Amino acid sequence: MLNNAMSVVILAAGKGTRMYSDLPKVLHTLAGKAMVQHVIDAANELGAAHVHLVYGHGGDLLKQALKDDNLNWVLQAEQLGTGHAMQQAAPFFADDEDILMLYGDVPLISVETLQRLRDAKPQGGIGLLTVKLDDPTGYGRITRENGKVTGIVEHKDATDEQRQIQEINTGILIANGADMKRWLAKLTNNNAQGEYYITDIIALAYQEGREIVAVHPQRLSEVEGVNNRLQLSRLERVYQSEQAEKLLLAGVMLRDPARFDLRGTLTHGRDVEIDTNVIIEGNVTLGHRVKIGSGCVIKNSVIGDDCEISPYTVVEDANLAAACTIGPFARLRPGAELLEGAHVGNFVEMKKARLGKGSKAGHLTYLGDAEIGDNVNIGAGTITCNYDGANKFKTIIGDDVFVGSDTQLVAPVTVGKGATIAAGTTVTRNVGENALAISRVPQTQKEGWRRPVKKK
C-alpha cells in the first residue's frame, strides 16, 4: 500500500516519579539501550520524515543522551496531558502528512505493528491501536456503536457500564496532519483530571463522520508502558526471551535461554554454542562453531570460526581470527587482535596489542601497545611497561621469540626474531635476532642462614 509522508511525535515529558531516579524515565535502559531510543529507532525504520520529541523534565540530560539523533525538540513546560503535549508539537505538522503518535516509555512497539496501523488508517480518518485485557482497570475504554469506534472514555470518567468494556486504548494513533491540528484546537480540559486528553479527538472525528479503524498489536508486550523499575525489568525479560527464541530457531545453542542477555546485534555462523549468563553487547559477530563459556561478556567484537572462549572472559572491541582460545578470566580490551590459533590464558589482559599466529600468553600477563609475531611464547607474569606517566610506547616482539616468566619489557623496545628472554629479566634495550637477553642480579647463597624470630 502506498503511504503518505509521515512524521512521528514521541511523548517523553514525564518525570517518572515512580522510578525514584534522577534520570528521566525514558532514559532508563532496556537491553542496554534507552527506552526512548528503541522508539526513535522504530520511527526511523518506518521512514519518518521528522521525529518530534516532546520533552519536559530532564531536558538537558535527554539532549545530551540523544545528541546523535536528528530530532525536533518540542518543550512541554507544563504537563497538562497528552492532548496538551500534542498541541505543543502541532505547529510543526504539515497538512498533507500523516502524524503518528508514540510514547517514549513504551519501548517494545514493533515496526511491523506500526506499519499495519499505518496501512489501516482510512483516508481522512484515524488509525487506532487497541488491545483487549482481562483486567482493563485504569485504562481508557474504547466505545463502539454497531461495531464502529465512537470514542475513548478515560477510566476515571467512565460509567460503571463503560468500565465493563475490555477493549482499551494503547495511546498509539495516526491521523492526517491538517485533521490533527483542527481536532487538537478543539480540546478542552473539562474532565476529572483537568487535563487535555488526546483521546478526545476520537469522538471529534466520529462527530465529523470520519472513520476510525482499530488495529491490534501482535503481542501485548508491544504496548506495555513503564512506570516503575518492576515493569521495566519485566519488559527486559520479555525482550530477552524473544531474542533468545529467535537465536535458538536460527540454530544457536543457548544452554539456558533464561540466562542469556542480548544488548545489541548478534550475527552468527552455524553450530554456535553459548553457555549460561553470557552478555552480548553492541555489534558482535560469531563465526562457525564458536563456543562461549559461562559468564562471558562480548562487546563490539568479531570472533572467528572455531574459537573457544572459556568462562568469565571479557572481550571488548577486539578481533579474533580462526581457532583462537582465550580464558578463563581473560580480558581483551579495545584494539586487541589475535591471529589464527593464538592463545590467551587466565588472568591475561590485552589492549591495543596483536598476538600472532600460534602465539601464546598463558598466564598472569599484561600486553599493551604491543605487536607480537607468530609462534611466540609469553611466559607467566610478563608485563609490557608501555606508560611512563605521560605517554604510551610500543613493544615489538618478532616471530619465534621465547619470553621467560616474570619479564618486564620497558617500551619502546624491540625483540628480534628467534630471541630468548630469560626469566626475571627487565628488558630496557633492543634485543637482536636469536640472542639471549638476561638481566638477573647474580644469585648469592649464605650457608646456615637462621630465620629471624619474633621477640616476646
UniProtKB/Swiss-Prot annotation:
Identify the pathway. Answer: Nucleotide-sugar biosynthesis; UDP-N-acetyl-alpha-D-glucosamine biosynthesis; N-acetyl-alpha-D-glucosamine 1-phosphate from alpha-D-glucosamine 6-phosphate (route II): step 2/2; Nucleotide-sugar biosynthesis; UDP-N-acetyl-alpha-D-glucosamine biosynthesis; UDP-N-acetyl-alpha-D-glucosamine from N-acetyl-alpha-D-glucosamine 1-phosphate: step 1/1; Bacterial outer membrane biogenesis; LPS lipid A biosynthesis
Region of interest: N-acetyltransferase: 251-456
Q: Where in the cell is it found?
A: Cytoplasm
Q: Where is this region: Linker?
A: 230-250
GO molecular function terms here? glucosamine-1-phosphate N-acetyltransferase activity; magnesium ion binding; UDP-N-acetylglucosamine diphosphorylase activity
Annotated positions binding Mg(2+)? 105, 227
Q: Name one GO biological process term.
A: cell wall organization
Keyword annotations for this protein, in alphabetical order, are: Acyltransferase, Cell shape, Cell wall biogenesis/degradation, Cytoplasm, Magnesium, Metal-binding, Multifunctional enzyme, Nucleotidyltransferase, Peptidoglycan synthesis, Repeat, Transferase
- Record Pfam families: Hexapep, NTP_transf_3
Task: Please tell me which top-level EC class this enzyme sits in.
Answer: transferase
State where UDP-N-acetyl-alpha-D-glucosamine binds.
11-14, 25, 76, 81-82, 103-105, 140, 154, 169, 227, 333, 351, 366, 377
The record's free-text note on cofactor binding: Binds 1 Mg(2+) ion per subunit.
Which cofactors does the annotated protein need, by name?
A: Mg(2+)
Listed Gene3D superfamilies: Hexapeptide repeat proteins, Spore Coat Polysaccharide Biosynthesis Protein SpsA, Chain A
Binding sites annotated in the UniProt record for acetyl-CoA: 380, 386-387, 405, 423, 440
Q: Which residues form the active site?
A: 363 (proton acceptor)
- Please give the GO cellular component terms listed in this UniProt entry: cytoplasm; membrane
Q: Which transformation does this protein catalyse, written as a reaction?
A: alpha-D-glucosamine 1-phosphate + acetyl-CoA = N-acetyl-alpha-D-glucosamine 1-phosphate + CoA + H(+); N-acetyl-alpha-D-glucosamine 1-phosphate + UTP + H(+) = UDP-N-acetyl-alpha-D-glucosamine + diphosphate
EC nos: 2.7.7.23, 2.3.1.157
Q: Note the NCBIfam families from the entry.
A: glmU, PRK09451.1
- Please describe what this protein does: Catalyzes the last two sequential reactions in the de novo biosynthetic pathway for UDP-N-acetylglucosamine (UDP-GlcNAc). The C-terminal domain catalyzes the transfer of acetyl group from acetyl coenzyme A to glucosamine-1-phosphate (GlcN-1-P) to produce N-acetylglucosamine-1-phosphate (GlcNAc-1-P), which is converted into UDP-GlcNAc by the transfer of uridine 5-monophosphate (from uridine 5-triphosphate), a reaction catalyzed by the N-terminal domain.
Entry's family note? In the N-terminal section; belongs to the N-acetylglucosamine-1-phosphate uridyltransferase family.
Identify the HAMAP family for this entry.
GlmU
Q: How is the subunit organization of this protein annotated in UniProt?
A: Homotrimer.
Q: What is this protein called?
A: Bifunctional protein GlmU
Which source organism? Escherichia coli O157:H7 (strain EC4115 / EHEC)
Organism taxonomic ancestry: Bacteria, Pseudomonadati, Pseudomonadota, Gammaproteobacteria, Enterobacterales
